[in-house]
C-alpha cells in the first residue's frame, strides 16, 4: 500500500548561477585576514604562496632561508624574487616601528607601598627591607625593582617624592 502523502523529490533550480554561488560560499568561509595592508593587497584568485611572494613575504621560512647557502644561484631564482607589491612591506614595517602600548600597570597597593618606602627611606633599600611594612619580606634588590617600575610608570610623582624627601 502506498503512502498517503507523496514525498517530493529534489528539484534542480536552473535559474541559479552555480559558479557564482560556489565563489560566494568560498569567499564567505575564507579566513579573515586581520592585517589591513595584507588584506587590501590580497588576490583571491591566487594561491597563498603566490600572494605572499608578490608582497615580498615568505610562505615557508625553510625555503626562504636555506640551512646551507648554495654556491651558485640560478638566474631563475633571482628573477622570481621580484617584489610586485612593495607598499605592503612598507606598511608592515611602519606598523612594526610603532611603539607598543604598555598593558601592564601597577596596582594601587604597590603604589602605596613604594610611596611609603621612598618617603621614609629615600633610596636606602637595605633599610626598606627591614621596614615593618615589608610584609612579603622583599629583598633590597626586589624593592629596588619595584621602585624602578614605579619610576617608569610615574616619573613626575617619583621626582616630586625624591625632592620632598631631600628637603626634609
Swiss-Prot record:
GO terms for biological process: ribosomal large subunit biogenesis. This is Nucleolar protein 16. Coiled coil: none annotated. It is found in: Nucleus, Nucleolus. Keywords: Nucleus. It comes from Xenopus laevis (African clawed frog). It holds the Pfam family Nop16. Belongs to the NOP16 family. One of its GO terms (cellular component) is nucleolus.
Amino acid at each position: 500500500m502506498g503512502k498517503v502523502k507523496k514525498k517530493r523529490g529534489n528539484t534542480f533550480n536552473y535559474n541559479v548561477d552555480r559558479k557564482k554561488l560556489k565563489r560566494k560560499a568560498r569567499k564567505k568561509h575564507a579566513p579573515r585576514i586581520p592585517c589591513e595592508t595584507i588584506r587590501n593587497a590580497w588576490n583571491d584568485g591566487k594561491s597563498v604562496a603566490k600572494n605572499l611572494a608578490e608582497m615580498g613575504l615568505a610562505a615557508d621560512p625553510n625555503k626562504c632561508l636555506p640551512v646551507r647557502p648554495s654556491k651558485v644561484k640560478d638566474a631563475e631564482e633571482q628573477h622570481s624574487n621580484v617584489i610586485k607589491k612593495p607598499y605592503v612591506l612598507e606598511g608592515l614595517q611602519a606598523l612594526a616601528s610603532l611603539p607598543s602600548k604598555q598593558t601592564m600597570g601597577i596596582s594601587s597597593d604597590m603604589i602605596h607601598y613604594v610611596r611609603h618606602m621612598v618617603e621614609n627611606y629615600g633610596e636606602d633599600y637595605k633599610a626598606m627591607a627591614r621596614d615593618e611594612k615589608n610584609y612579603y619580606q622583599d629583598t633590597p634588590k626586589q624593592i629596588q625593582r619595584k621602585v624602578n617600575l614605579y619610576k617608569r610608570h610615574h616619573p613626575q610623582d617619583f621626582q616630586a617624592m625624591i625632592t620632598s624627601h631631600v628637603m626634609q
